[in-house]
């Protein structure tokens, strides 16, 4: 017996247009209709802060999942109760905090690919906050630290930790090679 139902969400974006997301949810969490309309207002400033940070921190990094993980790391700090992040309650607070995301620069260009990744992650984050399971998060919530060398990014739960995220979750950005 299939215990999943497919849910369709159409999201209106402040940057214009809509995005439709299909995902499977456990039946006990599914609504009676398989066609659900939910509108998420994603602030253009939040998209821009993330995209400009990605430009400075991860623009040469492949795969896309690692770029998305930088956004999730930032959002993890926004949501964190950890003392180190007590004054960081917005995306702007996190990326402009002294000695944190050094790649953020207000003059960094807005590159379409990075804007798309930032917008996608913000939509997934909002869906998660609304109780949607399995939104395609690529980094666990406890990972609030990262560093990169221009080729790869490494994420950890403590800035002194020698243990890094192992990329064991599914990659929602993986292209279907079969069609």
Language model features with spans:
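N-terminal export signals and maturation junctions of secreted/periplasmic proteins
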Residues: 1-47
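Bacterial extracytoplasmic/cell-wall-associated proteins, especially those involved in peptidoglycan
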Residues: 30-31, 35-179
């Amino acid at each position: 017996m299939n215990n999943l139902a497919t849910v369709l969400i159409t999201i209106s974006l402040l940057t214009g247009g809509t995005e439709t997301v299909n995902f499977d949810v456990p039946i006990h969490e599914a609504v009676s209709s398989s066609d659900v309309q939910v509108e998420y207002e994603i602030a253009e400033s939040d998209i821009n802060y993330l995209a400009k940070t990605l430009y400075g921190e991860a623009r040469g990094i492949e795969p896309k999942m690692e770029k998305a993980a930088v956004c999730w790391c930032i959002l993890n700090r926004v949501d964190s109760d950890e003392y180190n992040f007590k004054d960081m309650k917005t995306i702007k607070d996190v990326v402009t905090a002294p000695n944190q995301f050094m790649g953020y620069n207000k003059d960094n260009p807005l590159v379409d690919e990075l804007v798309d990744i930032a917008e996608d992650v913000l939509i997934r984050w909002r869906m998660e906050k609304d109780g949607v399971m399995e939104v395609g998060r690529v980094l666990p919530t406890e990972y609030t630290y990262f560093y990169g060398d221009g080729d790869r990014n490494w994420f950890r739960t403590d800035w002194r930790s020698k243990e890094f995220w192992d990329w064991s979750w599914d990659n929602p950005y993986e292209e279907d090679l079969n069609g």
